[in-house]
Structures are given as structure tokens and as C-alpha cells.
């Protein structure tokens, strides 16, 4: 096989439609758009969900439920492995995590998760701590302090 003999598999590629090039092409004159009407015009067509002026389904059905999602507290996540960089005996606070750039917006809410290993005894202060993270920190001889609920939402 030579470089000039390379070709895609038959049927793998389609030739593009050249519209408006005579009736012999099958796509001449109206270019497959039919006659007149909104969909025949350039830029024509209706938005998704438009039902021709009839009240759309989404507005015919009643509203249901309630969502508090915009006000949900979104914690910055820190794993146990990220705490390994601190020296033994350090008190790890959200302010310290911000300063050392372990995570951004740590003061708005930090949750410590249990991925990785920890070999140093640290005192960890966070807004939330997973059970596996708590076990690993305490197994390394450290302490966990849960500080008050995060007041600001992390957006």
C-alpha cells in the first residue's frame, strides 16, 4: 500500500449536497425547502417548543415542587492527601487552606473528604468532615473540630 492509495472505507464519507444547482441535481430551484412559508426563508424556523401559537405543553402543565438549589451551601473539597503537605502539629483552618492555595474560597465553607493517606498528627478545623476523613485524621493522632455552618454560599 502506498500513501496515494489510502482512501476511506466505502460509505464512510458522504458528498456534501450542492443545492440550487439546477433541476438535474434533484436539489435545484427551492433547494429542498419546499415552496414559501417561514421554513423556506433564510433564518426561518421556529424555536424549540413552539407549537404554532397554541399554548405549549410546558405552560399547560402545572408547576410542581420546590427547589432550594440556589441557596445550597457548596463546600470547597479538600482531601486528606492534600493535608499531608502541612507539618505535624499544625492547626489546619480554612484561612490557612486559603493562604497556602490548597483551595479557593475556603473561608466560605470547607469539607474534608477521605481520599488518600495521612501520616502526620494535625488539628483540622473545617465546616464539614466525612466519616472516612475523620477516621484517617484521628488514626494519625490528629483531632477534628467541626466549626459553625458555612454562612455564605460558595458560588
Swiss-Prot record:
Belongs to the universal ribosomal protein uL15 family. Gene3D superfamilies: 3.100.10.10. This is Large ribosomal subunit protein uL15. It comes from the Bacteria. Residues 21-31, 42-52 have a biased composition (Gly residues). Residues 1-63 are annotated as: Disordered. GO terms for cellular component: cytosolic large ribosomal subunit. PANTHER family: 50S RIBOSOMAL PROTEIN L15 (PTHR12934), LARGE RIBOSOMAL SUBUNIT PROTEIN UL15M (PTHR12934:SF11). GO terms for molecular function: rRNA binding; structural constituent of ribosome. Part of the 50S ribosomal subunit. Keywords: Ribonucleoprotein, Ribosomal protein, RNA-binding, rRNA-binding. Binds to the 23S rRNA. Pfam families: Ribosomal_L27A (PF00828). InterPro entries: Ribosomal_uL15 (IPR030878), Ribosomal_uL15/eL18 (IPR021131), Ribosomal_uL15/eL18_sf (IPR036227), Ribosomal_uL15_bac-type (IPR005749), Ribosomal_uL15_CS (IPR001196). One of its GO terms (biological process) is translation. It comes from Symbiobacterium thermophilum (strain DSM 24528 / JCM 14929 / IAM 14863 / T).
